[in-house]
Amino acid sequence: MNNIEATLFLCFFCIFSSSNVHFAGAKQTAGNITPSENPFTPKASLIRYWNNHINGDSPKPSFFLSKASPLTAVDSTRFASLASNHALNTHHSDFCSAAKLFCFPELAAHSLEKHGDDVNFAAYSGKNFTNYGSDRLSGADSFKNYSGGDNIAVDSFRRYSRNSAGHDDGFTNYAGEVNVADQSFTTYATGTTGGSGEFTNYNTDANEPNGRFTSYSDKANGRSQTFTTYSENGNTGYQSFTSYSKNGNGAPNEFSGYGTGSNVVNTGFTKYGESANGANDSFTSYGENGNVPVNEFKGYGDGGNGAVYGFKNYRDQSNIGVDSFSSYAKNSNNEKVNFVNYGKSFNLGSDNFTGYGQDNVGGNVSFKTYGQGQSFKVYTKDGVVFARYSNNVSSNGKTVNKWVEEGKFFREAMLKEGTLMQMPDIKDKMPKRTFLPRNIVKNLPFSSSTIGEIWRVFGAGENSSMAGIISSAVSECERPASHGETKRCVGSAEDMIDFATSVLGRGVVVRTTENVVGSKKKVVIGKVNGINGGDVTRAVSCHQSLYPYLLYYCHSVPRVRVYETDLLDPKSLEKINHGVAICHIDTSAWSPSHGAFLALGSGPGQIEVCHWIFENDMTWNIID
């Protein structure tokens, strides 16, 4: 035992020898500490906190205790001291590793070494590509099954194919089915002549796909870029294109099947095609069948000459969605922009065209069969044609709810023994993390006013994916509570206990669905038990937020019914899972565009809506 450990042990011994604390007993199943377990670990501290703040009759569930920090007592004290002195960033890698946090892996430093030969990467991941294909004459580089299926895929491409001639790049099945993707393309194909870049099945079926294309194909001459099935079926995430094809000459770009079937994926195009000559860009089936796709075009095609931009089936058949076109094709010469089947959403979206085609000389803009909800401000009055404006958008029928997974929402009447129903995907898609000890959390910044400090602590560079993830979580936590809602974001198990007991009292129990068996399959409802006698009751529901450490968004739900039920295999009728479902009785404050109403029909306040508690989410209730 070194001097630090000895000092800590004596300090802890003095504190606890004078307090009424018992460390004897059985293993975690009994909610006590084993004789061999250090009584000063974060987990041991959590068990004592539970004993002191929750009535003794309430069971200590293993799934909750398992989320305690794995830090040793010494490390917990050391990192707490660093946090209180604003020096935790100096031990970022050590902290991430010891506390089992979600941190992006550190890529090898950028190298100035040139790679002049053709490369063929298959089943490869975690690479920093610098100067690949630079100054190349012809040849091709191929990336197949790159970063596929990874939990966290972080790749950086810098100066790739820069100043090359006739050089082709192909990305096939790139970062598909990953959990969190962070892909960076900086000065990619800048100053190239000819050649092509092709992205096929890029970030397909990814959770939280994030990509940044900066100065991509800047000053390129005749180089084509194709994005096919890009971020298809992706979940959340942000894709940014900055100065893409800027100052290019005759460089066609094609987006086909971009973001199709995705859920809340944001895309930003800034200075895309600015001052380009003879650009030819087409967006086909862009954001089609998506749920709330958000796209921003800022300074797109500004100052261009002779460009042709085509949008076909753009955001067609999607749910809601938000598009913003600012200074699009402004100050351009002879540019043509065609929108066909634009924004025919099932639920009214929001589209703003500001400074659209303004001062465009000799060009024309046409809208054919475009949806309701568009706003056109300061656009050129000459050369803009509007045809077949459509406002017969309907939110009825199966076509509307195809993006809402079957079984995600259901009616209370389904919770009857013998009912055959579809189970949604209840698997936790987020990276595995743990809570931080409270003595560390209380010393960490967590507000929009200190966002820069948070980025520094967790090594998140400005405009990086991690910076966006952190900002999004903080913003959601600071969002004002809905009418009748009490909410709090918690980063320690003790904080969650405090919030739950402040709403429900000390006699509480916490539940979650037992496992993920039956997920995405048909199941039969077995024995059903209504919590609190099946009466309308109160609950505190806690849902994970993506953040470096385990962060939960907890909120009070005042009028619900909560059920436990056995889930049976449809063929053998054997028990395969024990599910927890919550039914919201009062939905009057919900948005009319909520996925529950698209899936079930009806609207706010007209029906109750039920859903399962997914893996690693939980609900707190008053103990029976």
UniProtKB/Swiss-Prot annotation:
Q: Which residues are glycosylated?
A: 128, 145, 280, 352, 364, 392, 463
Indicate the secretion signal residues: 1-26
Tissues of expression = Expressed in flowers and stems.
Stretches forming FXXY repeats: 121-124, 129-132, 143-146, 157-160, 171-174, 185-188, 199-202, 213-216, 227-230, 241-244, 255-258, 269-272, 283-286, 297-300, 311-314, 325-328, 339-342, 353-356, 367-370, 376-379, 386-389
Of the GO CC terms on this record, one is: apoplast
InterPro entries listed in its UniProt record: BURP_dom, PG-associated_BURP
Q: What does this protein do?
A: Involved in cell size determination.
Q: Output this protein's name.
A: Polygalacturonase 1 beta-like protein 2
| Originating organism | Arabidopsis thaliana (Mouse-ear cress)
